[in-house]
């Protein structure tokens, strides 16, 4: 009885859906009038030779599943009604026979729990019969619901680890390249600074000794203080004008520079010679070349030999 009720519920739901899709009433579908009307229209379109039955259904906006449902429902309802009438008849006869037996035979009251829940049996393949492919779809949904969350978690964790590792490698490479580039830039700037710097071979100790000797000799002279006194005296205006005129005349005529404009050098200035050909090439003296190449990370074979010679000498093996 439970299976029959389940089938009736499914039938009512199907009737509602088909009635909504096609616009046909449920009474017309159950009585077979809808099927007769559809068959008449299909026959009219087919006899004209314009299209086939499938094309006619598509033209009317009705799918083959809906047409099959409309054609099956009247037969199913008629058979179900006959089966229900037969079941009622059998049930009535059974009830009569049961009453006669209870009257004739004294039976004890059963001790089974009268409040026990009854579950209607349903064929697992019933839904797949009416709706092909439903069981496979439900199985796929159950599978995804069971392990889909774990799969997404594992895939997300793997992707996150890959992103972190790749980002770490990229950052390490970028920092390493930036450090090397900045180091090379600094060393290149230092090398160019050394090339363009004014180099002087200083003789400061000798200058200090000469100054001390000059001080000692001046102290020994009796008239040094007097000469210094007259030398430090200021010039009167006529003498100052005459001195300025001589200085300007000598400087304008390309004469020698007065001693007051000559700066005492603390050493010997090293002169650098540029390349003869205008090729914008860098020129470095031989004595500075090992230093410049060392800043760029290259050591000439000659300098390597010098380093080996200046290093600790190995003891010669006696023969």
Swiss-Prot record:
Motif Nuclear localization signal boundaries: 311-319
Region annotated D1, chain positions: 266-301
Residues spanning the membrane: 287-307
Any Gene Ontology biological process: viral penetration into host nucleus
UniProt KW keywords: Capsid protein, DNA-binding, Host endoplasmic reticulum, Host membrane, Host nucleus, Late protein, Lipoprotein, Membrane, Myristate, Transmembrane, Transmembrane helix, Viral penetration into host nucleus, Virion, Virus entry into host cell
Signal peptide: none
Lipid tethering residues (N-myristoyl glycine): 2
Region (DNA-binding) residue spans: 306-319
GO molecular function, one term: DNA binding
UniProt xrefs under InterPro entries: Polyoma_coat_VP2 (IPR001070)
A GO term from the CC aspect: host cell nucleus
Similarity remark: Belongs to the polyomaviruses capsid protein VP2 family.
Protein name: Minor capsid protein VP2
UniProt source species: Murine polyomavirus (strain A2) (MPyV)
Record lineage: Viruses, Monodnaviria, Shotokuvirae, Cossaviricota, Papovaviricetes
């Amino acid at each position: 009885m439970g299976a029959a009720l389940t089938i009736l519920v499914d039938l009512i739901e199907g009737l509602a859906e088909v009635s909504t899709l096609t616009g046909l009433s449920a009474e017309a579908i159950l009585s077979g009038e809808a099927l007769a009307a559809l068959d008449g229209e299909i026959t009219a379109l087919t006899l004209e030779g314009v299209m086939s039955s499938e094309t006619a259904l598509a033209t009317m906006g009705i799918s083959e599943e809906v047409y099959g449902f409309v054609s099956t429902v009247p037969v199913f309802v008629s058979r179900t009604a006959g089966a229900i009438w037969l079941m009622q008849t059998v049930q009535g006869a059974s009830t009569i026979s049961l009453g006669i037996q209870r009257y004739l035979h004294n039976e004890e009251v059963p001790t089974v729990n009268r409040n026990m829940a009854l579950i209607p049996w349903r064929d697992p393949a019933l839904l797949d019969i009416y709706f092909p492919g439903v069981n496979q779809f439900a199985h796929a949904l159950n599978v995804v619901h069971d392990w889909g969350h774990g799969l997404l978690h594992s895939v997300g964790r793997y992707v996150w680890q890959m992103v972190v590792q790749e980002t770490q490698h990229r950052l390490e490479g970028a920092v390493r390249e930036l450090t090397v580039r900045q180091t090379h830039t600094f060393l290149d700037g230092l090398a160019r600074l050394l090339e363009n710097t004014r180099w002087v071979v200083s003789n400061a100790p000798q200058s200090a000794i000469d100054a001390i000797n000059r001080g000692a000799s001046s102290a020994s002279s009796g008239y040094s203080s007097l000469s210094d006194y007259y030398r430090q005296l200021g010039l009167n205006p006529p003498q100052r004008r005459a001195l300025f005129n001589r200085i300007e005349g000598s400087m304008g005529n390309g004469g020698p520079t007065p001693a007051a404009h000559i700066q005492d050098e603390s050493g010997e200035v090293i002169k650098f010679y540029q390349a003869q050909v205008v090729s914008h090439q860098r020129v470095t003296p031989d004595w500075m070349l090992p230093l410049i190449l060392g800043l760029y990370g290259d050591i000439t074979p000659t300098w390597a030999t010098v380093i080996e010679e200046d290093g600790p000498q190995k003891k010669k093996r006696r023969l």
